[in-house]
Amino acid sequence: MLSCNSANADYLFHKERASYDGSLDVGDKTLQCGRVIDIMKLWTYFKGNGWKQIAEQVENEHKLALYVKDYVIAHPDRYELVVPEVDTFNVCFWYKPVEMDRKNYKSEEEYLQLLSKVTVLAKKYMIDEGKLLVGYSSSKSPYYFWRTVTSNPYNTNEDMDFKMKLIGEYCEQAFKELMTK
């Protein structure tokens, strides 16, 4: 079943899972995750909603992604865009902990390696606490960053503010733990 349905989407279902129980990522083992079922989901959604409502929802999701991008830009001391242009529902960024000053690291590589560790550990805190679930990615680079996707038609700007604030809290907690090791 896994070999038939798996998309092997490393950007969604992280293979390393060093910091949390990988059995929670069951999506790659299900029929619903495969591309085969996507057209059926789209057709059913279209029949129930029509083009106008779908267009409004897509536009709203894109506006929310742009809102997150603007949030990151408005807080350059804490956030940094990885991909400056947002033309989808994905926003890729790093959270920079308060006490983590780029000038204190010998190289950019050392700095980004620590940001990656902070991201992965913060994801563990998210899963353990269960308040929020945001993915991270590496986009074929050795460094992990946050990859948030706006895909809930009921989300608001306030929900995005909450998400970004919580990401910051988890990252601050992760940084402190990493510095005490």
What positions do the PLM features span?
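Active-site C-terminal subdomain of aminotransferase-like
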Residues: M1-H75
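Generic recognition of stable, solvent-exposed alpha-helical segments in well-folded globular domains
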Residues: I37, E56-K63, Y67, V86, ...
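Short, hydrophobic beta-strand segments
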Residues: T44-Y45, C92-Y95, W146-S151
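A generic structural motif
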Residues: G48-K52, E99, N152-N157
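Surface-exposed helix-capping loop/turn segments at secondary-structure junctions
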Residues: V72-V82, K176-K181
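Short beta-strand
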Residues: E80-V86, V134-S139, K181
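Conserved PLP-binding catalytic core of the aspartate aminotransferase-like
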Residues: L81-M126
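PLP-dependent enzyme catalytic core of the Aspartate aminotransferase-like
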Residues: Y105-E108, S138-K181
